[in-house]
Amino acid sequence: MLRLFQAASRASLRLSGSRVIHSLAEGAERPAEISEPRDSAGLLDPVLRKCELRIPVHRRPVQAWVESLRGFEQERIGLAELHPDVFATAPRLDIVHQVAIWQRNFRRISYANTKTRAEVSGGGRKPWQQKGSGRARHGSIRSPLWRGGGVAHGPRGPTSYYYMLPMKVRALGLKVALTVKLMQDDLHIVDSLELPTADPQYLTELAQYRHWGSSVLLVDLTHEEMPKNVVAATSGLNSFNLIPAVGLNVYSMLKHQTLVLTLPSVAFLEDKLLWQDSRYTPLYPFRLPYSDFP
C-alpha cells in the first residue's frame, strides 16, 4: 500500500508539474501574439494647440479632439490642450441656474398696468347720503370696493426685473457650462468654420452624420473672421446659430444641444475667464464693469 501511494503521488506530481509548465509556456506565448495598443494621442495625432496660460501644479491640461468641417470623414485631425480651470471645474449646477435665471430676467419687462380710482372714469359724486339710508357709507362708485372701480396696489407697468449679478458668478457660470458640455460630449472643437460649400443641406447632413443633435451653436472669434460659406449656410437654418466668442453665454449654451468652438475662440475664452479669477476688487463705479478688461 505504501508503494502504491508513493507511485500515485509521483504520477500526480508529474502531471501537475507538466500542467504548470504548459500553462507557463502558453502565458509566455500570449504577449507575442497580442500586441499592446499604442497611445494614438502621443504617437499618431499631433497636438494642434497647447495651453500657454499658467496651470496650477496639482492639475493637468484637459485634452480634446480637434475636428474639421471640410469633410464628413475628417472627424479627428489632432488634439487641443484646454485649461483645467475653465473646462474641468466643479459642476456647480446651482451657479448655472442662477446665471440662467438672471439672463431671462435681464430682458424681462412686464407691461401689466391697472387703473387706480383716480384714473377710472365716473364716480365724481357721492352715491347716497352719509346717514339715514341704512346702507354702508361710500363716497364714490369707483372705489376699489365697488365692481368696476379702481384697483388698489395693482401692477403699474412697465416693470423691469433687472438686477446685477456679480461678475465672478457670471464667469463661474460660463466655466461650469463649458465643463458640463465637454463632459457630456456636447462640446466640439474645430480648427475653423470653413465649409467646402454654402449649401445648408451640407451642414445639416454633417450634423446628422456626427450626431450633433437637433440644435447647434457655432462660435467664432469675431464677426469679421467668420467664413462666408458658414454665414450663408446658417442664415437659412433655424437649428444653427452663429455668434462671436464675446457673445457666448450660459442661456445660449443650455438652449442648444451642441456647442462648436474654434481654436481662436477657445484661447479668447480662456484668457477672459481666467482674468476674472485674478482681478482686483474694482475701485471704479460698478456701472462700468468692463472698463479694465485686458
From Swiss-Prot:
Span-the-membrane segments of this chain are none
Query: Pfam families attached here?
Result: Ribosomal_L4
Q: Name one GO molecular function term.
A: structural constituent of ribosome
* Biological process annotations from GO: mitochondrial translation
Record's SUPFAM superfamilies? Ribosomal protein L4 (SSF52166)
Q: Where in the cell is it found?
A: Mitochondrion
Q: Which UniProt keywords apply?
A: Methylation, Mitochondrion, Ribonucleoprotein, Ribosomal protein
Q: Please give the family membership noted in the entry.
A: Belongs to the universal ribosomal protein uL4 family.
Positions carrying Omega-N-methylarginine are 147
Q: Which InterPro entries match?
A: Ribosomal_uL4, Ribosomal_uL4-like, Ribosomal_uL4_dom_sf
| Record region (Disordered) | 119-139
**Chief subcellular location:** mitochondrion
Positions of disulphide bridges = none
Quaternary structure annotation from Swiss-Prot or TrEMBL: Component of the mitochondrial ribosome large subunit (39S) which comprises a 16S rRNA and about 50 distinct proteins. Interacts with MIEF1 upstream open reading frame protein.
By what name is this protein known?
Large ribosomal subunit protein uL4m
Q: Does the keyword Ribosomal protein apply?
A: yes
